[in-house]
Amino acid sequence: MASTSSQGTPQPAPWRASFLEHLSKMDSPEFVFSSLHPAPKNSPTDFLPRARYCIFRGFWAELPENKHNNAPVNERNYESEMPTFTTDVRMGKPLEVFASSSGHADDRSQTQGSGGGGPCEAVWWVKETMVQWRIKGEAFVVGPDIEGKEGEKESSGVRTVKSEVGSRMRVVQEEGREGWSWSKELTGHFGNNSPGLRGMFCTYSSTCRAWD
C-alpha cells in the first residue's frame, strides 16, 4: 500500500459533473493527447508538439467497472480529476512525458518505470453536446515499479508520482483505505483493456498470457 497525501485535500472540480455527463454521451471516449517530443539536434527549439488520439479510461482511482476484468481491483476509496489512458513503453508518449519533465530524460532507458511530469494537454470534442473540453497539466507514468518488492528502495520517479498524483487524490471512503494499492490500480487498468490490446502490450513470454 502506498501513501497518499492527506494534507490540503483537493475539492471536487466545479466542472466534474458536466464533464462526465458529456463524455457518457460519446460512443467512444476518444480525446487528443498532446505532449512535447525532443527536437532533432541543431533545431531552433528543444521540443516539438506531438498529438495522437487516445481512449479516456476514467479518472485516476476511479477504475470503471468491467464485468470482463478478472483482475483484483481497489475499493473506491479515492477520486480525482486526473484523466487516465493506457500506453506501451515502446510508444512515443512515455519518452515525451519524461523528456519534457524537470528530469529531462534523454534516453529510453531512463523511461522504463514510473515518473515523468512533462507538460501535456488533452482535448475532447463531444459532438453530441457540441462542447469542447480542454485540460492542461502535467502527465505522469505509473509503471510496474510503482510498488517494488518489500525492502527495495523506491526510485525518484516512483516518489515523484506518489507525491504529485497522491496529493491530487481525495478520500471518499475511509473503510478499506489501508488496503488501497497503486499496483492493484495499475493492474486493474491493464485488465480493463481488451484481450487484443493487452496482447499488443506484451511479449510472448510475459505474464500477459494469464489474461487470455
Locate the predicted segments by residue.
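Binding-site signature for planar aromatic cofactors or substrates
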Residues: 1-212
